[in-house]
Amino acid sequence: MISSLHRPTVARVDLEAIQANIDKIQRHLPKKVKTYAVVKANAYGHGAVAVSKAVEDQVDGYCVSNLDEALELRQAGIDKEILILGVILASELQLAIKHQLTITVASLEWLELAKKESVDFSQLHVHVKVDSGMGRIGVRSLAEANQLISILSDMGVQLDGIFTHFATADESDHAMFDKQLTFFKQLVEQLDKRPALVHASNSATSLWHSETIFSAIRLGIVIYGLNPSGNSLSLPCPLKEALSLESRLVHVKQIQAGDSVGYGASYVAAEPEYVGTLPIGYADGWTRNMQGFKVLVEGEFCDIIGRVSMDQLTIRLTKAYPIGTKVTLIGQQGKQVITATDVADYRGTINYEVLCLLSDRIPREY
């Protein structure tokens, strides 16, 4: 998708804030360990290449979701380790080897398919994924893990690491978390052959569960300045939200009592009022259910009225602002702030989703 560079809607990304967030988190950790920056999903909407380059001196490697995300970083000249967290097609192994990418191996069935590929397995770097209770991908028993590692060794593969992922690390109830941690610890301790790198810590566990820090951590949403729990748990160190979302008024008018605005005529004015139009809509990731939420105009909150359209939305203004007036959808104006978590709470979702949904139509400025 082509970025819409010729309309006044933009996501501004503060790379220095991301750098500062990483520094604060690393100083908070009880020990120095290998650090991966998680830049999957276009760095949670912040721009994978720009973020990866900005933090290159602070991290040991990167985590992405799939092969294409890894290739994007390599093609941008990023040469540090890249771990693909998802499962790639066995038929794509040669690409992973060619670009020196580390892949995840999650099952014996996949490994049998991989063995059929004509590649130099001695050049392949892998981490084994353990499903300790998340229920997505990974080996689910010590026997399966030992068998998989044995086959990988026989193939001559570079077995670099083993890892798991927690389902409830950002929740106050620790029962499921404790169950997963115990399972993973016992499995790792009993392996016939233990890889050098062991990691289980994502953003939430790095902040609130230092007992999960083995020899590496994977820092995701926290480096972008957001709380993994939303507002359920307090951050142990202050972070700065790195992304702000701005647009500008492209049309301003006065409507009268009884006039309607938007699809379905779902908003009807009760009295004369000023209405402004912004060039951003649900095709940009600002979803239809944001009707009734607020934006900031000159430091004052203004309501979104009418349904959010594909490309535009309308707001109720306190006066007739001139065309070109800046409007903040996420970020700070004056003393007022709208956070991605505020948006998420209104939508009934999580701050991760809010940022990841911001489409490529919105240019990122650094």
Swiss-Prot record:
Catalytic activity: L-alanine = D-alanine
UniProt cofactor(s): pyridoxal 5'-phosphate
Pathway where this protein functions: Amino-acid biosynthesis; D-alanine biosynthesis; D-alanine from L-alanine: step 1/1
Pfam families: Ala_racemase_C (PF00842), Ala_racemase_N (PF01168)
Coiled coil start-end: none
Active-site feature positions: 40, 263
Stored InterPro entries: Ala_racemase, Ala_racemase/Decarboxylase_C, Ala_racemase_C, Ala_racemase_N, Ala_racemase_pyridoxalP-BS, PLP-binding_barrel
Any Gene Ontology CC annotation: cytosol
Function summary: Catalyzes the interconversion of L-alanine and D-alanine. May also act on other amino acids.
Family affiliation: Belongs to the alanine racemase family.
Protein name: Alanine racemase
Designated gene of the protein: alr
